[in-house]
Amino acid sequence: MSFRINTNIAALNAHSIGVQTNRNIAGSLEKLSSGLRINKAADDASGMAIADSLRSQSESLGQAVRNANDAIGMIQIADKAMDEQLKILDTIKAKAIQAAQDGQSQESRRSLQSDIRRLMEELDNIANTTSFNGQQMLSGAFTNKEFQIGAYSNTTVKASIGPTSSDKIGHIRMETASFSGVGMLASAGGNNLTEVALNFKATDGVNSFELENVRISTSAGTGIGALSEVINRFSDKLGIRATYNVMATGTSPVMSGTVRGLVINGVRIGTVNEVRKNDSDGRLINAINSVKNQTGVEASLDITGRINLVSLDGRAISVHADGEASHVFGEGNFTGISGNNHAIVGRLTLIRTDARDIIVSGVNFSHIGLHSAQGVAETTANLRQLRGMFGADIASAAGANANKAQADINRQGIGAGVTSLKGAMIVMDMVDSARTQLDKVRSDMGSVQIQLVSTINNISTTQVNVKAAESQIRDVDFAAESANFSKNNILAQSGSFALAQANAVQQNVLRLLQ
């Protein structure tokens, strides 16, 4: 056993351990007071780097959620505005339907048109004023807008909102055969004209659609009325709707005289004696209408005294009479019927509720006037034109000049909006087209909103998991650290006692010197 005075090894060891224990106590107190296991890089260098990366990712995901919520807010603003526009369109259509009956006077139709014009102004006002943070939402400028929805660059969602102003929606394409089709009967007493098969090109942008053959004749269940039914049966595939008008009009007022051997559509009416000028007593009209259920043709007089024959079901109209009948009916007989062995087929109108062209071909389709050599009255209109006058181009393309031999675009228009029966029909088509366009825009916005909601749910879940991973690395385990602090506290107390004992041992040297 040796005793040294200059170097107290035991005391030095006790001191060194005590210093380390105090350092550990300080570290424990720092962790317990901050709640963090890593307070500085020295605590866990690699762990700190990972935790910092996770914290950055979590904060970025939080901002991404806020971005997505901003996008949803913008979409909801536009959606509610468009919902109001759709309500306006519903009201306009209801007023157009109200105007589309001849019980309305011209004055009442003008009142309805005035209401519609006000509604149109509000529709455009909504389109021009709906905005978010200074950005116009419904003007068409909100296109391919990107929203960052991830923690890393180029993780975006794109959103576009189409224009909803009246000049950008409600497009309809109208085409009407320029000539009211005229066919040659097999014989003066026959009724067969031809068979027509139509082929509509690129109805869906790519494919064509061929319709079944339809017989064009003066018999029931044939003619362009039957052809229109076939077209409308497949309107969902074609995107095209058909209307027709089969009318024969005298070229001049009815003159006095006797009509002998009158035959309409193969049904013999016989002789109508002593017809008065302008058929003032109605005997000619009554004679023709007495067999209208057999002929499918109804007669009336217009305000000029000309006789009008209208096909009730769209079959062709043929008229045969002897001798001076042409003088009675009006010189030159009926518009479009130049002889007793001819029949008027009528005029077919095709309407498409978008701006695409109507491309049609087929077998014998020239017999119904749809031939480039004959010419087709055609135009594209939009909802904005509802605020003004429907000009001659719209009137002709919509078949408004049905009682004319040729749908001449130089003829007069049909007035403003619903101020005419035909105009009211056009307004209904425009509104239907506008509704379809707005519903498509809303549907696209709804899809984006669903995507954003799903993204928010996913990001929120990811953010929670990232925060949990960061917490596992950065946050302190209070139970373990409290136990560690208690251990170090006890060690500090025992170390102080040990250091005191180590210093006391050196006093034994004095005993040796006594």
From Swiss-Prot:
Residues spanning the membrane: none
MF term (GO), any: structural molecule activity
InterPro entries named in the record: Flagellin, Flagellin_C, Flagellin_C_sub2, Flagellin_hook_IN_motif, Flagellin_N
Pfam family of the protein (one): Flagellin_C
Keyword check for Secreted: yes
Localization terms from the record: Secreted; Bacterial flagellum
Keywords: Bacterial flagellum, Secreted, Virulence
Superkingdom classification of source: Bacteria
This protein's record includes keyword Transcription: no
Listed NCBIfam families: PRK13588.1
Function description: Flagellin is the subunit protein which polymerizes to form the filaments of bacterial flagella. Important for motility and virulence.
Subunit record text: Heteromer of FlaA and FlaB. FlaB is located proximal to the hook while the remainder of the filament is composed of the predominant FlaA.
The family this protein is said to belong to: Belongs to the bacterial flagellin family.
PANTHER family cross-referenced by the UniProt entry: FLAGELLIN
Protein name, entry field: Flagellin B
Protein's organism: Helicobacter mustelae
Gene name of the encoded protein: flaB
